[in-house]
UniProtKB/Swiss-Prot annotation:
Keywords: Chloroplast, Electron transport, Heme, Iron, Membrane, Metal-binding, Photosynthesis, Plastid, Signal, Thylakoid, Transmembrane, Transmembrane helix, Transport. The 4 large subunits of the cytochrome b6-f complex are cytochrome b6, subunit IV (17 kDa polypeptide, petD), cytochrome f and the Rieske protein, while the 4 small subunits are PetG, PetL, PetM and PetN. The complex functions as a dimer. GO terms for biological process: photosynthesis. Residues 1-31 form the signal peptide. Heme binds at Y32, C52, C55, H56. GO terms for molecular function: electron transfer activity; heme binding; iron ion binding. It is a single-pass membrane protein. GO terms for cellular component: chloroplast thylakoid membrane. This is Cytochrome f. The keyword rRNA processing does not apply.
């Protein structure tokens, strides 16, 4: 089985498991990590943009916090925050309203990877909870993804990470490395094939007069908006269940004028930070140096006191 097929099957299986665990029906618009894994060999483009932004068009703030420096072969935590108003509801694939789901991709330096369960301290395990992080692909263990998961529970995530050991991995050095992170809340507006989801604005395809607005399905919802152009031709714009119409019959519209509101309440954001893989020998050398400086200072103080005593004795004599 090729790596691409393996990745697709594994990602799809994970999406189903996570959806069941979160009590969510995993629709294509929700399973955004699967889209990225299926369509992009690398989630970060050459211009620095993370590919999730291709489908999640709105921007929202995200935050990531990691230690300033770590020692080799050490487990540390990255804290991810996807802040949003927990009271808002998003449009689901069936047009109904529901809670937002969240997901993220974390691009670590080469050599860094998800910490094995037996290496993760109990304190960090408790913070991680039931989240299951997976590598982006079998060859890219330094890139981690998770989602969709319930936003109310996981708007803050803790990722246990194992730092590499340059003594064992010759491709790693004691340097400062960048870490890239992208996170989103809510469903996307565009599918990878370019088609719109029902979580976005729908615009008029032509200028003219709205001559009819017809319900597509009483059960599933949605509308057909018929627009008569100046030459008498009638074009029909189909609007799925989800967005609310903001036009009415008899109204004149321009091409690309919004026919609906913007139902999207989520958004995507990305951030980056840095981490230093610290050489233990440097720390030991620094401690020795500080100890030497401290000892020198103590000896100088003692020598000064001894000199003062000698001076005092000579004056008394």
């Amino acid at each position: 089985m090729s790596n691409q097929v393996f990745t697709t099957l594994r990602a799809a299986t994970l999406a189903v498991i996570l959806g069941m665990a979160g009590g969510l029906a995993v629709s294509p618009a929700q399973a955004y990590p699967v889209f990225a894994q299926q369509n992009y060999a690398n989630p970060r483009e050459a211009n620095g943009r993370i590919v999730c932004a291709n489908c999640h068009l709105a921007q929202k703030a995200v935050e990531i916090e990691v230690p300033q420096a770590v020692l080799p072969d050490t487990v540390f935590e990255a804290v991810i925050e996807l802040p949003y108003d927990k009271q808002v509801k998003q449009v689901l694939a069936n047009g109904k309203k529901g809670d937002l789901n969240v997901g993220m991709v974390l691009i670590l330096p080469e050599g860094f990877e998800l910490a094995p369960p037996d290496r993760v301290p109990a304190e960090i395990k408790e913070k991680v909870g039931n989240l299951y992080y997976q590598p982006y692909s079998p060859e890219q263990k330094n890139i981690l993804v998770v989602g969709p998961v319930p936003g109310k529970k996981y708007s803050e995530m803790v990722v246990p990470i194992l730092s590499p050991d340059p003594a064992k991995n010759k491709n790693v050095s004691y340097l400062k490395y960048p870490i890239y992170f992208g996170g989103n809340r809510g469903r996307g507006q565009v599918y990878p094939d370019g088609k719109k989801s029902n979580n976005t604005i729908y615009n008029a395809s032509a200028a003219g007069k709205i001559v009819a607005i017809t319900a597509l399905s009483e059960k599933k919802g949605g509308f057909e908006v018929s627009i008569e152009k100046a030459n008498g031709e009638v074009v029909v714009d189909k609007i799925p269940a989800g967005p609310d119409l903001i036009v009415k019959e008899g109204q004149t519209v321009q091409a690309d004028q919004p026919l609906t509101n913007n139902p999207n309440v989520g958004g995507f954001g990305q951030a980056e930070t840095e981490i230093v893989l610290q050489n233990p020998a440097r720390i030991q050398g620094l401690l020795v140096f500080f100890s030497f400086v401290l000892l020198t200072q103590v000896l100088l103080v003692l020598k000064k006191k001894q000199f003062e005593k000698v001076q005092l004795a000579e004056m008394n004599f």
